[in-house]
Amino acid sequence: MIKQRTLKNIIRATGVGLHSGEKVYLTLKPAPMDTGIVFCRTDLDPVVEIPARAENVGETTMSTTLVKGDVKVDTVEHLLSAMAGLGIDNAYVELSASEVPIMDGSAGPFVFLIQSAGLQEQEAAKKFIRIKREVSVEEGDKRAVFVPFDGFKVSFEIDFDHPVFRGRTQQASVDFSSTSFVKEVSRARTFGFMRDIEYLRSQNLALGGSVENAIVVDENRVLNEDGLRYEDEFVKHKILDAIGDLYLLGNSLIGEFRGFKSGHALNNQLLRTLIADKDAWEVVTFEDARTAPISYMRPAAAV
């Protein structure tokens, strides 16, 4: 049986919020079977818990934000991408502020934290959402689609008319049956244009942003001294974001996601459209791991 997974141990980290610039204390904790991923604002009294579900997404400007009443948790997508990539079904994410720390702008530090905590299998079957037929949403020239696929695949295309992007790969397709999330996707950093960052700061956004946690591009070059981590790091980060956004379904996917210039808003619209169309998907489990189209790394001992 493919079993649900949680963390073996509690692990903590400190960082800053990309948009708020605030110092944030992050604690990842094991959670019981069928809990899902739950964000907890421990700076509030009483503590407010917000499950990582598509219906709890309230804002999608610059990042994916979970909302419950007037309480929010910003920038959940990179941590959720790491949870999805490592097959974590159940965990509590405690935060001392309203934003998940940006770390280095990728999912890499979160992968390291989760692997350091160790993975614990639980005595319950892991539930997958299998796409049964195509579902799509469009907005202008942007498009996001789910199609049936016996595995998990994410294809994405960006289209930036900018000197840094011309001649560089703007399309990528990752089939996770043959490609490692950790090696090929998790280290791709978020990116931004210097002109946009200056404007965002004037609006009290991106206050924590720097070349330490993002790829920063000016009119004709990448400003980061070390350059890019992957030749196609820009589009790979969009794949990383999409994986995090898709994990708001609450389960791992069996199917393919295709995005063309899609972002957090359209990704969430696609999830809501899928959820509402009960004939387009089904929940499945696997009694025999050998018959499953998706496999996960074996739980390693805690470091």
From Swiss-Prot:
One of its GO terms (biological process) is lipid A biosynthetic process. Its cofactor is Zn(2+). Zn(2+) binds at H78, H237, D241. Belongs to the LpxC family. It holds the Pfam family LpxC. Catalyzes the hydrolysis of UDP-3-O-myristoyl-N-acetylglucosamine to form UDP-3-O-myristoylglucosamine and acetate, the committed step in lipid A biosynthesis. This is UDP-3-O-acyl-N-acetylglucosamine deacetylase. NCBIfam families: lpxC. Its EC number is 3.5.1.108. GO terms for cellular component: membrane. The active site is at H264 (proton donor). The gene is lpxC. It is an enzyme of class 3 (hydrolase). GO terms for molecular function: metal ion binding; UDP-3-O-acyl-N-acetylglucosamine deacetylase activity. It catalyses: a UDP-3-O-[(3R)-3-hydroxyacyl]-N-acetyl-alpha-D-glucosamine + H2O = a UDP-3-O-[(3R)-3-hydroxyacyl]-alpha-D-glucosamine + acetate. Keywords: Hydrolase, Lipid A biosynthesis, Lipid biosynthesis, Lipid metabolism, Metal-binding, Zinc. The lineage of its organism: Bacteria, Pseudomonadati, Pseudomonadota, Gammaproteobacteria, Pseudomonadales. Pathway: Glycolipid biosynthesis; lipid IV(A) biosynthesis; lipid IV(A) from (3R)-3-hydroxytetradecanoyl-[acyl-carrier-protein] and UDP-N-acetyl-alpha-D-glucosamine: step 2/6. InterPro entries: Ribosomal_Su5_D2-typ_SF (IPR020568), UDP-acyl_GlcNac_deAcase (IPR004463), UDP-acyl_GlcNac_deAcase_C (IPR011334), UDP-acyl_N-AcGlcN_deAcase_N (IPR015870).
